């Protein structure tokens, strides 16, 4: 745990339940990030918020302590039934829901509040069995949650707190009708603690907050600083045919402890993964086509250090919270400016330093002006020497969706041109 703190506000100085402070302290959390320092004093009084903050700013620990504190300091509704959770946290992707659940487990163990998960891609009976025993806090995606509501497995009639995480992404993925479906089945907004977090507080996000929340207070974390000061950005202009060789050369030069390579399409991700894995690098592939059980296994291997490099699409990687990612490579410049910020936000977290390297190739260089306008600064450009790059491409692996935890860096030998 890196002890670097971004504010002077301590969790222990906030009016949190002592058990929650103990849980946070046990995980090394002492000081608040800006989003936590601004939001918790508001939500701990029971007031709603709509918060704008980028990925990697500590949003999860801005809302989890507030939810737990609210349930611990307020009596549960009279005549509450077993199938009625007291709080619901909704995320746009199953990976983010799983990560939030993982972060919540420590607080749950210190407070005796029961957690439940609801997301697609896993056998429904496993989740149903857990929910039928009764949970206090349900964490999930909208689709599977609605399925359980329609089946009577859960009922929204006793909800006392609601969190919408990455609300802008929910709009992008077309989930807002689902969100409204669930809101209509909850008690009125005035009887709940409501929290919304989004990378942007666009008009449509603010409209959602106005419609389903109780006069939320808007908070923004330095919106003019779109990228973290902890991230060093670097830009190369490779030709299309040089991209793979340049990527391999940069990886060999730096030997990242933990890196994520982003590409714009599933096909490109598979190709990049094939060359990296074929070169003996411990590499995992994360796209929407990878079966859920394999995705979870690959993510765990990456988190545990059994895999050094993750090749991913934006949809598959959005919302992931993986500590100590040292490098992010934009193999393709994204078409969406916000995706650039989300991608490089995988590194430089919690005070750690990170490096974000982007390739402006012939196909995607036209995305660069809009990205630089959005982040309000030019990305520093570096040149590469073709004569210093690797001689040739490795044989590309064709077996898909498999990580390679058994190969080792010290077995990797390549020849440079000199």
Swiss-Prot record:
PROSITE patterns xrefs: DEAD_ATP_HELICASE (PS00039), HELICASE_ATP_BIND_1 (PS51192), HELICASE_CTER (PS51194), Q_MOTIF (PS51195)
Quaternary structure (record): Component of the RNA degradosome, which is a multiprotein complex involved in RNA processing and mRNA degradation.
Alphabetized GO MF terms: ATP binding; ATP hydrolysis activity; RNA binding; RNA helicase activity
Entries under NCBIfam families matching the protein: PRK04837.1
Motif Q motif positions after renumbering to this chain: 9-37
UniProt-listed Pfam families: DEAD, Helicase_C
Motif DEAD box: chain residues: 165-168
Protein's UniProt keywords contain Secreted: no
GO CC list: cytosol
Domain named Helicase C-terminal: residues: 243-390
GO BP terms: RNA catabolic process
Compartment(s) of residence: Cytoplasm
Enzyme class: hydrolase
Main location (coarse class): cytoplasm
Similarity comment: Belongs to the DEAD box helicase family. RhlB subfamily.
Cross-referenced InterPro entries: DEAD/DEAH_box_helicase_dom, DEAD_box_RNA_helicase, Helicase_ATP-bd, Helicase_C-like, P-loop_NTPase, RNA-helicase_DEAD-box_CS, RNA_helicase_ATP-dep_RhlB, RNA_helicase_DEAD_Q_motif
E.C. code: 3.6.4.13
UniProt keyword terms in alphabetical order: ATP-binding, Cytoplasm, Helicase, Hydrolase, Nucleotide-binding, RNA-binding
Residues that coordinate or bind ATP: 53-60
Protein's organism: Psychromonas ingrahamii (strain DSM 17664 / CCUG 51855 / 37)
UniProt protein name: ATP-dependent RNA helicase RhlB
Function: DEAD-box RNA helicase involved in RNA degradation. Has RNA-dependent ATPase activity and unwinds double-stranded RNA.
Every Helicase ATP-binding domain range: 40-219
Catalytic function, reaction form: ATP + H2O = ADP + phosphate + H(+)
SUPFAM superfamilies linked: P-loop containing nucleoside triphosphate hydrolases
């Amino acid at each position: 745990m890196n002890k670097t703190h971004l504010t002077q506000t301590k969790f222990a100085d906030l009016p949190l339940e002592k058990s929650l402070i103990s849980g946070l302290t046990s995980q090394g959390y002492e000081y608040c990030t800006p989003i936590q320092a601004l939001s918790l004093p508001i939500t701990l009084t029971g007031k709603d918020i709509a918060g704008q903050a980028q990925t990697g700013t500590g949003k999860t620990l801005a809302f989890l302590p507030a939810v737990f504190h609210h349930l611990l300091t307020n009596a549960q509704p009279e005549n509450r039934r077993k199938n009625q959770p007291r709080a619901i946290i909704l995320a746009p992707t199953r990976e983010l829901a799983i990560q939030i659940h993982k972060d919540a487990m420590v607080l749950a163990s210190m407070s005796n509040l029961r957690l439940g998960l609801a997301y697609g891609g896993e056998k429904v009976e496993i989740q149903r069995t857990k929910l039928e025993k009764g949970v206090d806090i349900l964490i999930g995606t909208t689709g599977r949650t609605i399925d359980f509501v329609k089946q009577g497995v859960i009922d929204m009639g006793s909800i006392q707190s609601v969190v919408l995480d990455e609300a802008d992404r929910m709009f992008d993925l077309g989930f807002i009708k689902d969100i409204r479906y669930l809101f209509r089945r909850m008690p009125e907004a005035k009887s709940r603690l409501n929290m919304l977090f989004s990378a942007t507080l666009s008009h449509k996000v603010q409209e959602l907050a106005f419609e389903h929340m109780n006069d939320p207070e808007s908070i923004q974390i330095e919106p003019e600083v779109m990228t973290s000061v902890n991230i060093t950005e670097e830009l190369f202009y490779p030709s299309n045919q040089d991209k793979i060789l340049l990527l391999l050369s940069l990886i060999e030069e730096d030997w990242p402890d933990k890196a994520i390579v982003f590409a714009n399409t599933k096909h490109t991700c598979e190709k990049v993964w094939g060359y990296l894995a074929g070169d003996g690098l411990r590499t995992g592939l994360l796209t929407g086509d990878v079966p859920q059980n394999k995705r979870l296994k690959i993510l765990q291997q990456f988190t545990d250090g059994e895999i050094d490099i993750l090749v991913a699409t934006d949809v598959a990687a959005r919302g992931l919270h993986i500590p100590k990612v040292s490098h992010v490579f934009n193999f393709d410049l994204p078409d969406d400016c916000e995706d650039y910020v989300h991608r490089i936000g995988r590194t430089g977290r919690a005070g750690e330093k990170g490096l974000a390297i982007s390739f402006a190739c012939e196909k995607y260089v036209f995305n660069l002006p809009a990205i630089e306008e959005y982040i309000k600064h030019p990305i520093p450009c570096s040149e590469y020497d073709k004569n210093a790059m690797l001689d040739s491409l490795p044989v590309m692996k064709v077996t898909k969706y498999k990580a390679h935890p058994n190969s080792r860096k010290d077995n990797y030998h390549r020849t440079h041109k000199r």
